[in-house]
Amino acid sequence: MPDPTSPKPDWLKVRLPRTDKYGAVKDVIKKYNLNTVCSSAMCPNAFECWDGGCLTFMVLGNTCTRACRFCTVTHGPAGEPLDSNEPQRLAAAAKELDLSYVVITSVDRDDLPDYGAGHYAACIRAVKEQLPGARVEAIIPDFTGRLDLLEQVVDARPDVISHNIETVERLSPSVRDRRAGYYRSLDVLRDVKRVNPHMLTKSSLLLGMGEEDIEIKEALHDLQEARVDIVTLGQYLRPSIRQWPVHRYVAPGEFSELAEYGRSLGFKYVAAGPFVRTSYRAGEQYVSVIADSRMA
């Protein structure tokens, strides 16, 4: 396990923004009183993405009812009252930023009767209405595995639905909240395809939490069997000493090997690298998949 006081490897250095775009994105988020997972989860790509005019909106408030040990998002037994104007504000912000690819994620809301599914679907529809030419990716919670709630989000017609297994099967009970589950997450991904066989699906793994190489490959096989189209693999970076410790730093070469292995399994797209996250360059992932499907 790396010494937490030691410098990180050179490949984990984050570049600072170079243009005024970062500030412009920040101003729009503040103007419309919105949350982003980029800030709430201390994403290492925030500078690069905002500098490029990309961001991931976080809906349903900023308090998660689950407490995964790797995550720095504020958590508690209940979140804030739902803001019925949030879908329209989100869509207005996306329009002002002239986004062609809009990524939406959320906290878990186990305190709500529908776990936030209706509000989430309303956010997707609002973006589709105000930006009919934009693509929308929804990074969803598990909605406790309820198919009727998942259907609400699928029926809002996002272009991609992502749901993350986060880590390998062995570590899932230790790293994720007890209400989450490795196999439940796989079932959610399968259920998306049951509701709409043509929906693109995506999932993500964070590496360096203590997993073995064979376990990563087993997880990739599980995702392939769940008919997932896009997989992302990234380095887990401990937000603070309160979160799960980093067990190792995965070298860029190993990420490249895992990406090649994933492609050999038949995924339509595999993104792997130290800073790769579910929404990292998500628009590029989508364009690549669509382009490849048209050439097939």
UniProtKB/Swiss-Prot annotation:
<dbReference type="InterPro" id="IPR006638">
    <property type="entry name" value="Elp3/MiaA/NifB-like_rSAM"/>
</dbReference>
<protein>
    <recommendedName>
        <fullName>Lipoyl synthase</fullName>
        <ecNumber>2.8.1.8</ecNumber>
    </recommendedName>
</protein>
<feature type="domain" description="Radical SAM core">
    <location>
        <begin position="50"/>
        <end position="268"/>
    </location>
</feature>
<feature type="binding site">
    <location>
        <position position="71"/>
    </location>
    <ligand>
        <name>[4Fe-4S] cluster 2</name>
    </ligand>
</feature>
<keyword id="KW-0408">Iron</keyword>
<keyword id="KW-0808">Transferase</keyword>
<dbReference type="GO" id="GO:0005737">
    <property type="term" value="C:cytoplasm"/>
</dbReference>
<feature type="binding site">
    <location>
        <position position="43"/>
    </location>
    <ligand>
        <name>[4Fe-4S] cluster 1</name>
    </ligand>
</feature>
<dbReference type="GO" id="GO:0046872">
    <property type="term" value="F:metal ion binding"/>
</dbReference>
<feature type="binding site">
    <location>
        <position position="68"/>
    </location>
    <ligand>
        <name>[4Fe-4S] cluster 2</name>
    </ligand>
</feature>
<dbReference type="GO" id="GO:0016992">
    <property type="term" value="F:lipoate synthase activity"/>
</dbReference>
<comment type="pathway">
    <text>Protein modification; protein lipoylation via endogenous pathway; protein N(6)-(lipoyl)lysine from octanoyl-[acyl-carrier-protein]: step 2/2.</text>
</comment>
<dbReference type="InterPro" id="IPR013785">
    <property type="entry name" value="Aldolase_TIM"/>
</dbReference>
<dbReference type="GO" id="GO:0051539">
    <property type="term" value="F:4 iron, 4 sulfur cluster binding"/>
</dbReference>
<keyword id="KW-0949">S-adenosyl-L-methionine</keyword>
<feature type="binding site">
    <location>
        <position position="279"/>
    </location>
    <ligand>
        <name>[4Fe-4S] cluster 1</name>
    </ligand>
</feature>
<keyword id="KW-0963">Cytoplasm</keyword>
<dbReference type="InterPro" id="IPR007197">
    <property type="entry name" value="rSAM"/>
</dbReference>
<feature type="binding site">
    <location>
        <position position="64"/>
    </location>
    <ligand>
        <name>[4Fe-4S] cluster 2</name>
    </ligand>
</feature>
<comment type="similarity">
    <text>Belongs to the radical SAM superfamily. Lipoyl synthase family.</text>
</comment>
<keyword id="KW-0004">4Fe-4S</keyword>
<dbReference type="Pfam" id="PF04055">
    <property type="entry name" value="Radical_SAM"/>
</dbReference>
<feature type="binding site">
    <location>
        <position position="49"/>
    </location>
    <ligand>
        <name>[4Fe-4S] cluster 1</name>
    </ligand>
</feature>
<keyword id="KW-0479">Metal-binding</keyword>
<dbReference type="InterPro" id="IPR003698">
    <property type="entry name" value="Lipoyl_synth"/>
</dbReference>
<keyword id="KW-0411">Iron-sulfur</keyword>
<feature type="binding site">
    <location>
        <position position="38"/>
    </location>
    <ligand>
        <name>[4Fe-4S] cluster 1</name>
    </ligand>
</feature>
